[in-house]
Amino acid sequence: MEVWRPSYKYSLITREFGVTDLEDLCFKYNYCQPCVGYCIVPLNVWCRKFGKFASYFVLRSHDTSHKNNFGVITSFTSYGNTVSEAVSKLVESASDFIAWRAEALNKYG
């Protein structure tokens, strides 16, 4: 099995399937505008068993300095048999994480 990961280089960017809701959430909590990409998963990689399509998104803060890992907070990847399924799963998990992180930061910091 080959090592494979989604890349913005060979992908399509979408604003459908709930991505606009994710954009609203990112603006609400002061993150950079999300760029959600999706691509076809190759046949000869281990993650093909999770679905034919992969969607991914990198959550970034506005502080892009070197000491802050260039603004990268975390990344998300979701798989599905259709583009809408993959992107919808991604939006749901990213939205849950953003809401949880906002609550945790308010609680502890």
Curated annotation (Swiss-Prot):
It comes from the Viruses. Pfam families: Corona_NS12-7 (PF04753). Belongs to the coronaviruses ns12.7 protein family. Isolate N5 belongs to genotype C. Genotype C probably arose from recombination between genotypes A and B. This is Non-structural protein 4. The lineage of its organism: Viruses, Riboviria, Orthornavirae, Pisuviricota, Pisoniviricetes.
